[in-house]
UniProtKB/Swiss-Prot annotation:
It is an enzyme of class 2 (transferase). This is Glutathione S-transferase U4. Residues 90-217 form the GST C-terminal domain. InterPro entries: Glutathione-S-Trfase_C-like, Glutathione-S-Trfase_C_sf, Glutathione_S-Trfase_N, GST_C, GST_C_Tau, Omega/Tau-like, Thioredoxin-like_sf. Its EC number is 2.5.1.18. Keywords: Cytoplasm, Detoxification, Phosphoprotein, Transferase. Signal peptide: none annotated. One of its GO terms (biological process) is glutathione metabolic process. The keyword Transferase applies. Pfam families: GST_C, GST_N.
Amino acid sequence: MAEKEEDVKLLGFWASPFTRRVEMAFKLKGVPYEYLEQDIVNKSPLLLQINPVYKKVPVLVYKGKILSESHVILEYIDQIWKNNPILPQDPYEKAMALFWAKFVDEQVGPVAFMSVAKAEKGVEVAIKEAQELFMFLEKEVTGKDFFGGKTIGFLDLVAGSMIPFCLARGWEGMGIDMIPEEKFPELNRWIKNLKEIEIVRECIPPREEQIEHMKKVVERIKSA
């Protein structure tokens, strides 16, 4: 389906993994889009108008239709633009991709980053709890080039935008090697494979800028 850039608009924030994964999906499918950078602190009238429920990015505007929440947007993109499928066709495999994506956003993010930043139980305890979660993903990607198999898919976009190109830079800023190669060889191999994909590289935020951004996030978490 040929689209013009003005038909597809994405409101996002440069350091947001939720925004990055949507951009990866657009690039994977070759969909032209207009990107509108948002200030997530001083939210624009446009953002508040089109996403009054969550008041956050990303937001997709397509031919007057508005969608928020990255998982919802990714599924919608996959249904509208059929080329280079993101989700598996098999119902069970599709359900499992959605399951693990939810696991990444709802379990890995809060435990592996927020808990470590707060360190209420001590940093070492928090790291141990986080690494127990990563072991599930280590097993899930074992023997595969990507979570999606030979090509990147839904879970690769979700986990890839969140773990190596967001959380890992936060851990780096805290001086923590959360996913050491000797303990997680499969995850590290997967990360290397991701970095070889052009559309992924195009969507990765600048490393040093993101590390500084994540340091500020850590300070906000600690002071909350």
